[in-house]
Amino acid sequence: EMLRSLVGSEMCIRDRHLTSRQSVEIPFIKLDDVENVKAALAEGDVEPGVCGPRVRTITACQGQAICPSGCIDTYSLAKELDDRYFAKELPHKFKFGITGCQNNCLKSEENDLGIKGGIKVDWRESDCIGCGVCVKACRQGAITLEDGKISVDKSKCNFCGRCYKACPTDAWDTVHGYIVSFGGLFGNSINKGETIIPFVEDKEKLLKICDAAVNFFEENAKPSERFKFTIDRVGREKFEEKILEAYNG
């Protein structure tokens, strides 16, 4: 029904565009037809998106439901965040982006708040056969095999989970979680979002962090000021304090 509504034959809508943020755009609608088009779309349960100073459409890659590299269920998380924040009024636009793994197909660090799936691993010696497949799978050079024992340099590990996925004997204990970045921009100004907590291990903590970030922006931003510039102006130390408080609370 949603697809039929988007075809828009009754209103003679011939132009449709899939936007970079995974929405459907219908250009060239005459002003007098706008309400009729909205009503026709509503019959198929298609709701208008948003623009302006508010939380925008939350975007996500396909995640572990489709992609073998995926570390998290991106779709259900995007739906939950959408239900929680979509169209929330703020001093300026605020974008969420969710990507399932370190391949970063959705480029999470370009968003005001980016979420990247990750897997924290711990070697389980009892099930290891010393084949060295995990060493070859690790692109960060974080894993070494010496005298039949695996060592992991935690400072190099980026939580990609390749070692765990490649292991033929499942010799790894794993925790699926999230790498969260803040303050990304990719437009007139470009900035790579930065992490504060290396790895967030459960969704409840993730949601608390998201709430803290959105609330910080709502309470401190000036009109038409993007999140990155609010953090810079108010002070990164104060922002980090709020995020750590939410994480530890």
Please describe what each predicted stretch is.
Residues E1-G8, I13:
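Single conserved hydrophobic/aromatic residue that forms the stacking wall/gate
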Residues E10-D15, L41-G49, W172, F217:
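A common structural junction motif
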Residues R14-S20, C51-G52, P91-F94, L145-E146, ...:
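Flexible, glycine/charged-enriched surface loops at secondary-structure junctions
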Residues I29-V34:
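Helix N-cap motif at beta-to-alpha junctions
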Residues D45-I58, R84-T99, S155:
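Immediate flanking context of iron-sulfur cluster ligation sites
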Residues H92-K120, R236-L244:
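A gly/ser-rich beta-alpha-beta helix-loop segment of oxidoreductase catalytic cores
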Residues V133-V152, R162-Y178:
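Iron-sulfur cluster-binding cysteine motifs and their immediate structural context
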Residues G177-I179, G184-A221:
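A hydrophobic, small-residue-rich beta->alpha segment in the mid-to-C-terminal subdomain
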